[in-house]
Amino acid sequence: MPVLATPRLIALMENAALQAAAPALDEGMTTVGGEISVKHLAPSPVGATIEAHALLVSVEGRKLTFDLSAQQLQPADDHGGKLVGEGTHVRFIVHRQKFLDKL
C-alpha cells in the first residue's frame, strides 16, 4: 500500500533523537540506540511531509531518554498537523572510535 511504513516512521523519530543529542556531545562522542517503543497512530500517504521531534526528558550518566512524536504536516502548515506516531527512545553516549574498534 502507498503509505508511510512503520519502520520508516521509527527511523525518522530515531534520527530526531540523534540530532537532538548531537549539539551537547564532546568531540569524538556520539550516541547509539538502546531501546525504542513507538506507536504508529495514523496512516500517512507516501510523499506526505512528516516532521519528527525528540524531547530529552532524562539523563542518567551515559543514558539519554527521549519522548518522541511525529506529525504529518498539512499543506501551508508551519508545524503541528496530524499526530501519526509517538513513543520513547533510549540512547547511550559512547566514544565513537572505541565503539567502532569493538566491531
Label each region the model flagged:
Residues P2, K39, T88-F92:
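Generic structural detector for well-ordered beta-strands
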Residues M1-E27, K98-L103:
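Hot-dog-fold acyl-thioester-processing enzymes
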Residues P45-V46, L55-L103:
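HotDog/MaoC-like acyl-thioester-processing domains
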Residues L12-A16, H53, E86:
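Residues within well-formed alpha-helices
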Residues L18-E51:
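Hydrophobic beta-strand-centered segment that forms part of the acyl-chain substrate-binding groove
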